[in-house]
């Protein structure tokens, strides 16, 4: 009987605790939604993305380059000078990310890095650019030499 009463009391306590926390969670969720809505209201179309061809080779040294893929993919290959911060961890490790210099973030294709970049922008980083097409397109376009290749390309008639 004591076990049943103890379980019932524990369940009641848990239920009351969750009920009391629900309003605070709802307020936090509403605040987060308001913050995202405010960001989306004023962000430039395409302002957060950059193509590999738009980055001159010398500019990489002036940026913090974040590889948002997992550690195994980063170990296999990455943009020279990049640091590995998995896309889910950018806010948890935001103290490592400067606000006073350009930040380039990429993943394999650009989709996960776009989420990480969005989170950083909403959190106050207005210096973040997402590498359009990710690491795969960066490699396909010539890597560090993508800008030079694009500048030297002749239009086909």
Task: Name these PLM-found stretches.
Residues 15-21:
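Residues within alpha-helical transmembrane segments of multi-pass membrane proteins, especially transporters
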Residues 106-107:
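Short, surface-exposed ligand- or partner-binding patches at beta-edge/loop junctions that are enriched
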